[in-house]
């Protein structure tokens, strides 16, 4: 019996559950599935420039990491990436020639011509027939009946509106971080209540060090629900100033004692009157 070697390719801009379904479906139909990420395509730059979805999460490195994270426990799924720009050297803008260049690189990496090719797009069927003449072509859920989502829609609407469609790897990366500054005794209850309200996680900065913080952040992101909180320690703000500057939202419960120490960190200042409600209003803006 001949070994079934499969091919599934895409840009994964970004990886979503429609892609995941297609890859899992494909892997069940063959002995060995080679998933290819194509990046630096002619149209990719424009798509990223116009994206509402965070551009920093659409780099080739991030897309490849997301694919590898999702399928690391599947022994018959192999992840590869191809720099399409390098394939197109000495070619012109003719789409047939570009596809031919990419398919030659695919065959080189796989070690043979795939005998079964999977796609989620009907429009690519003719290209695949020319590029892999000996292969069976299988089109998966082309009308999006099982997963009514596309990477185009996610880029257009952003990560929060399309959260349920993102892969787990992308949810971990796209979760928004919210830092809460203020005196410990005064904000403890607020931090607890906000974490409960948004059904998410919180990182405590008290007695933090670089290694501990790295592990706690990863854990918080992995278990978060769109957002997660960082409870700042008023005693080590200066030590972690650069870290705080990188977060998505900083909220400062006004206290004259901290005005000077927080002057370099962009914060939303909230008085202790109606603090809980004001926090919610600012947090909800991140979720739009």
What are these regions (language model features)?
Residues 1-199, 207-212, 222-226, 231-248, ...:
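Nucleotidyltransferase catalytic core that binds NTPs
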Residues 216-220:
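A charged, solvent-exposed segment within the mature domains of Sec-exported extracytoplasmic proteins
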């Amino acid at each position: 019996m001949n070994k079934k070697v499969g091919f599934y390719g895409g840009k994964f801009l970004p990886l979503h559950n429609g892609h995941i379904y297609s890859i899992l479906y494909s892997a069940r139909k063959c002995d060995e599935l080679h998933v290819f990420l194509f990046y630096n395509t002619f149209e990719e730059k424009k798509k990223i420039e116009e994206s509402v979805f965070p551009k920093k999460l659409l780099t080739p490195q991030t897309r490849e990491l997301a694919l590898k994270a999702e399928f690391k426990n599947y022994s018959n799924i192999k992840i590869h990436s191809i720099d399409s720009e390098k394939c197109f050297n000495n070619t012109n803008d003719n789409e047939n020639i570009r596809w031919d260049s990419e398919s030659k690189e695919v065959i080189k990496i796989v070690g043979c011509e795939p005998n079964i090719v999977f796609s989620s797009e009907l429009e690519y069927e003719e290209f695949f027939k020319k590029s892999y003449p000996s292969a069976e072509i299988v089109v998966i859920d082309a009308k999006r009946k099982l997963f009514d989502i596309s990477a185009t829609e996610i880029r257009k609407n952003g990560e929060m509106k399309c959260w349920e469609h993102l892969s787990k790897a992308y949810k971990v990366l796209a979760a928004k971080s919210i830092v809460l500054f203020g005196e410990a005794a005064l904000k403890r209850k607020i931090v607890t209540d906000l974490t409960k309200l948004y059904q998410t996680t919180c990182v405590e900065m008290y007695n933090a060090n670089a290694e501990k913080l790295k592990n706690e952040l990863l854990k918080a992101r992995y278990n978060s629900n769109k957002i997660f909180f960082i409870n700042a320690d008023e005693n080590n703000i200066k030590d972690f100033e650069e870290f705080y500057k990188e977060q998505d939202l900083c909220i400062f419960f006004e206290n004259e004692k901290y005005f000077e120490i927080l002057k370099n960190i962009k914060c939303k200042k909230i008085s202790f009157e109606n603090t809980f409600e004001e926090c919610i209003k600012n947090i909800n803006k991140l979720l739009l």
